[in-house]
Amino acid sequence: MSRRVEFDMSHEDHTDRRRTNTFSSEEDGVPNEVADYLVYFSRMIDEQNVPEILTLYDQAFPDLTERFFRDRMWPDENVVERIIGPGNKLFIILYKELYYRQLYARNARGPLLVHRYESFMNYQELFSELLSSKDPIPLSLPNVWLWDIIDEFVYQFQAFCLYKANPGKRNADEVEDLINIEENQNAWNIYPVLNILYSLLSKSQIVEQLKALKEKRNPDSVADEFGQSDLYFKLGYFALIGLLRTHVLLGDYHQALKTVQYVDIDPKGIYNTVPTCLVTLHYFVGFSHLMMRNYGEATKMFVNCLLYIQRTKTVQSQQPSKKNFQYDVIGKTWDQLFYLLAICLAVQPQRIDESIASQLAERCGERMMHMANGNVDEFRNAFSTGCPKFLSPTTVVYEGVNQSKEPLLRQTQSFLEGIESQMALPVLRGYLKLYTTLPTKKLASFMDVDEENYDSFLGKLLTYKMIVNELGKEAGPSTVDDDEPQTDIDFYVDRDMINIADTKVARHVGEHFLRHIQKLQEVQDVLKRLDSAGQKP
């Protein structure tokens, strides 16, 4: 039984509002409770009452959907306009954004082409209102709704690209309409999608502001009235992460990381207020590092994200029933992260959080053992399970074979080429752990390397050394609070002799607690000074 959400409305107020329009509960088939909700929702948008908007969006909408619209759609825009009255263009646009999002969520095969087209036109109208205004729009929305707008926009673009590459997703009547859309390039084309996201960045000056913050400068010094607007700043921030995701789906990992180079991946970031945003950021940054063979940084991102999901698992378990109209990022990504983490640790073993390590061993222990022994099929299966749904924005198939999986096959091949070039590394590491000194010729014989391939073998040895060294290079904030090495082995080559050092050290639990006791004492001292300052007359 879903919990009903009550609205603090004046009966006289909302009745008067509905007397001025042509709404009829019997004719339009809309329950009075839903009509009251829409009137109140519209009023809260006008008043910019963010806490109340959050309740109406986050709790009331799913609650009413569960009770009244399990088997049918919410009323269309014309009925809603008769309920709330004319002159509420912005609310109608926002309502339609929710309407189409629910339409996508409840259709396993995806909505009809006409609904995909109408949804894009509604997004275009929304962003046009925001971007073409001479002054910042007087609109305040909760962080989670702002993120959901950007996230759903990118998701629907991805869904359209997969739809037009798969003839099995549409009926015969839609082919002609799709031909017309593609010829005119007026819906879900890559260029307007990227243009909208980059325009949000430009309008909000988000990159300049984040760069200023990173350089310890005042962000207001590089921002105009749009950049200083809370609405535009947050939309620009979330658009950065939307662009990160888009570039990864297109296979441009360097540009993806460049897009978020000034985003401070810190627990106190804006994205932390929206769990799905935090998970999206860490997943796609980590995946970009993995595809660029920076396995150490990828591991940090994946472990950080898994720890966050683990800590908030109780809350997140309530999300599907609470937001049944949303794309459940967290639930799906939880499994994907383990497969990607298994790949990273099979190629480049390192110490990670013990709770995550135990779950990883339970889920993927046997798979990792096969990968460490050079089983290419295990790498392929883990990658296919953990990767996102890649897309090709220019591929259109009007009839014939489904080509929506072609981008996945290309990215899988690219990934495996990188893995195959390093396939010997896990085996190499296994031999090095057995010795403190080892002649290069002897190691080569262990690995069945003949004289002709000896030079290339030395190259692989140097490659492994570079991977070990790479762990010391911080591309982001450290996930550990000590200086312990992340790998359990290090070595150097002196002429024809390999010198190996076991870098695995015992964890100094006592020192860990002492450090945090000191930090706690410092915080308490600051609080005492603030308290004494506040009590002064």
UniProtKB/Swiss-Prot annotation:
Q: Does the keyword Cytoplasm apply?
A: yes
Biological process GO terms, please? formation of cytoplasmic translation initiation complex; translational initiation
Q: What is its main location?
A: cytoplasm
Q: Where is the composition biased (Basic and acidic residues)?
A: 1-19
Q: Where in the cell is it found?
A: Cytoplasm
User: What is said about its interaction partners and assembly?
Assistant: Component of the eukaryotic translation initiation factor 3 (eIF-3) complex.
Query: What HAMAP family does the database record attribute to this sequence?
Result: eIF3l (MF_03011)
List keywords of the entry alphabetically. Answer: Cytoplasm, Initiation factor, Protein biosynthesis
Q: Which Pfam families match?
A: Paf67
Q: Name the domain of life this protein comes from.
A: Eukaryota
InterPro entries from the UniProt entry: eIF3l (IPR019382), PCI_dom (IPR000717)
Write down what this protein is called.
Eukaryotic translation initiation factor 3 subunit L
